[in-house]
Amino acid sequence: MKKLTQVLKLVGKPTKLFKSSDGTRVLVLPYGGRVLGLFAPGSEENFYWTHTALNSPESAREFYGGDQWHNSGGDRTWLAPEADLFFPNFPKLDKYFQQRSLDPGKYKVSEYDGAFSLVNRLTVSFSRLKKDVPLKITKSFGPALNPLRHERGIDLGGVEYAGYTQYTSLAITGSNVPGKAQVGLWNLVQMPPGGDQLIPTFARSEPRHIFSTIDTIPPRDLLTSDHLIRYRMRQKGEHKISVRAVSVCGRVGYIHPAGDNWALIIRNFVVNPSGEYVDVPWSETDYFGFAVQACNVNSGLGQFSELEYHIPAIGHGTGRIHCDDEAQVWAFRGPRAKVDQIGQMLLGANSL
């Protein structure tokens, strides 16, 4: 953490640090509004993926000096629907663009009573509606103690833990909702590559394939059972799947080898199938209701695995112009057998 913090400071990207009562350290980068690092007590090993350009001041300076998307890594907040907000020529898919008002945005740090929040006031353009919508995104952080700390019959000796709660809010700030605009929060975590994403489901649910840039996802890497989707994220290129809100249980995990140990990262969040989940397949824009996504990236953007979830939209037809989301990240690192047991308890799955 010290090296990453120093590099960012040297290139004019200062960080903030949230410390939990259990010793967890959460490294926040206001530039882009991201949680860039998650560290267990006494550990300098980041649970999250960060861009390799951040390994030195020279490469970081060159990276942030470019006009490309500055994908620093970690846990970020975007907005849906992707078709409107990232494809300026939709339904043509010839150009993908991260609106700079959103990422990196212009997040401001607000400090109060020893805590802090990040606030981004922005306007985004909807390509299909040909409308601009003024918004406000606010993010803050709190503790998330080990969910297994009171459980009996499990030996957590030798297992590192780090966790936090992220509070995210979205508001339409104009006096009226422009046109028929609906917009939803979309939170994404980037993790080291080569692991398995584990998506528990209430019943058997076949994931929707969104896109592949090279070939497709081999059937042996995308396994569906009655109560679990397992995506082995090891393909070349970029690949994405999406899962229905009515099926998912509100937890998604990612397990991968970490040196001599294994790491398990779990996101715990609220799913409301009565809400409007507006991120739709690009070829079927009236097919609403997808809440969870997984994206495998092994391309010029880097090598990482993304765990993504959506929050029901606000705006036209929803009766709301403001929403709040609260979600936890629970991260474990330790011997494989113990991490498997944790995965079984919290997700109904293990690394096998």
Question: What does each of the following model-derived ranges do?
Answer:
Residues M1-T165, S169, T173-L352:
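Surface-exposed acidic/polar loop and edge beta-strand patches at domain peripheries
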